[in-house]
């Protein structure tokens, strides 16, 4: 019951604390194209994460599950939206259902709603090979997310305090998983060094989960008597983390998440090097406050606006969008320069 209560607390506090919007995309400017040689009606948005083909560079990221009827209903509605727009979708951590079989229904509902959808299972880095297999089987998942959430755990009153052996555990899961493994952060971003470590053990897809969206340090601090306020602004901003990712020159697929709310955010993330983008808190807020039809409409508008932006840039495909010129400035440029990452290739391509 403690874990289920925590799931409901996370929804409540995630909605009340809001999105920080410190994702860094304001430091990214596209180079305007007066002769784009493009046609809105022929723009295509298909993309890939590793070997997984997606119809859209937008998917519904991990949010919830394991909190009884309320989380079942949320996942049911999100699965309907995913089916309507043919989007991939991830569930929240399934450890709750592995510990308590009665919670499995809140995850299994997505496959009932959308039998042919692309779904990602989700577990923390403490998971064993056997738990990973059970999580995948539970929802007949197409991929497995392993989330890294050190700062959330440290801020969580009942959270983990021992993070030894994590890389080795992930490696075992990667070597034994029957589906692709995506390693993701939960809002604190990833450094190039972390991504190089993950690539070295065979990980082929990473969700950088940058700072700028739902702040799980702030969420957990709401549940504490004594706040660890020094963690509230901890992390690497989303835009910065994407560039850190692409600077590794590894054969990795990258998912951009962390405060992404607009088609312009999506376009900038992809132009920086992401293969696709993921929405979580923003979609949850619309669903909970305005209803499912409003969320369906919002995703329609996101796709329309993304195609407008791609038309303006002369990018006919997502692959071409990854090659349009842009300028990195401000704090993002300063951070990357200090980290020894050259950004001039973005502006000169």
Swiss-Prot record:
Subcellular location: Cytoplasm
Gene Ontology biological process: isoprenoid biosynthetic process
Keywords tagged on the record: Cytoplasm, Flavoprotein, FMN, Isomerase, Isoprene biosynthesis, Magnesium, Metal-binding, NADP
Top-rank taxon: Bacteria
Gene Ontology MF, one: oxidoreductase activity
GO cellular component, one term: cytoplasm
InterPro entries: Aldolase_TIM (IPR013785), FMN-dep_DH (IPR000262), IPdP_isomerase (IPR011179)
Pfam family, any one: FMN_dh
UniProt: substrate binding residues: 6-7, 152
Keyword Magnesium: yes
Residues noted as binding FMN in the record, renumbered to the chain: 62-64, 93, 122, 184, 214, 258-259, 280-281
Binding site for Mg(2+): 153
Cofactor dependence: FMN; NADPH; Mg(2+)
Matching CDD domains: IDI-2_FMN
Annotated EC: 5.3.3.2
Catalysed conversion reaction: isopentenyl diphosphate = dimethylallyl diphosphate
EC category: isomerase
Primary subcellular site in the record, as a coarse category: cytoplasm
Stated family: Belongs to the IPP isomerase type 2 family.
Role according to the record: Involved in the biosynthesis of isoprenoids. Catalyzes the 1,3-allylic rearrangement of the homoallylic substrate isopentenyl (IPP) to its allylic isomer, dimethylallyl diphosphate (DMAPP).
Name this protein carries in UniProt: Isopentenyl-diphosphate delta-isomerase
Provenance organism: Bacillus cereus (strain ATCC 10987 / NRS 248)
Gene, per the UniProt record: fni
């Amino acid at each position: 019951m403690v874990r289920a209560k925590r799931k409901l607390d996370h929804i409540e506090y995630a909605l009340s604390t809001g999105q920080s919007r410190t994702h860094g995309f304001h430091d990214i400017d596209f180079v305007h194209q007066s002769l784009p040689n493009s046609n809105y009606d022929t723009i295509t948005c298909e993309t890939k994460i590793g070997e997984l083909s997606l119809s859209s560079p937008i998917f519904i990221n991990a949010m919830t599950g394991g909190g009884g009827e309320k989380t079942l209903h949320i996942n049911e509605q999100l699965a309907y939206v995913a089916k309507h727009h043919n989007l991939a979708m991830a569930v929240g951590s399934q450890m709750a259902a592995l510990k308590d079989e009665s919670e499995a229904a809140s995850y299994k509902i997505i496959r009932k709603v959308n039998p042919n959808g692309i779904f990602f299972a989700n577990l923390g880095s403490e998971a064993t090979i056997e738990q990973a297999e059970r999580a995948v089987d539970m929802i007949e998942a197409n991929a497995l997310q392993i989330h890294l959430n050190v700062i959330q755990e440290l801020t969580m009153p009942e959270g983990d305090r021992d993070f030894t052996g994590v890389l080795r555990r992930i490696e075992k899961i990667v070597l034994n998983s029957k589906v692709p493994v995506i390693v993701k952060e939960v809002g604190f971003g990833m450094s190039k060094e972390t991504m190089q470590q993950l690539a070295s053990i065979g990980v082929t897809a990473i969700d950088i989960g940058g700072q700028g969206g739902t702040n799980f340090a702030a969420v957990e601090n709401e549940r504490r008597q004594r706040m660890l306020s020094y963690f509230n602004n901890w992390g690497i901003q989303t835009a910065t983390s994407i560039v850190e990712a692409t600077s590794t020159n590894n054969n990795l697929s990258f998912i951009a998440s962390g405060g992404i709310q607009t088609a312009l955010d999506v376009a900038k993330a992809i132009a920086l090097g992401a293969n696709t983008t993921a929405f979580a808190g923003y979609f949850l807020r619309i669903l909970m406050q305005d209803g499912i039809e409003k969320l369906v409409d919002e995703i329609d508008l996101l796709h329309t606006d993304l195609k407008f932006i791609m038309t303006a840039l002369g990018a006919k495909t997502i692959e071409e969008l990854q090659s349009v010129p842009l300028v990195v400035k401000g704090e993002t440029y300063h951070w990357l320069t200090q980290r020894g990452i050259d950004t001039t290739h973005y502006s000169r391509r």
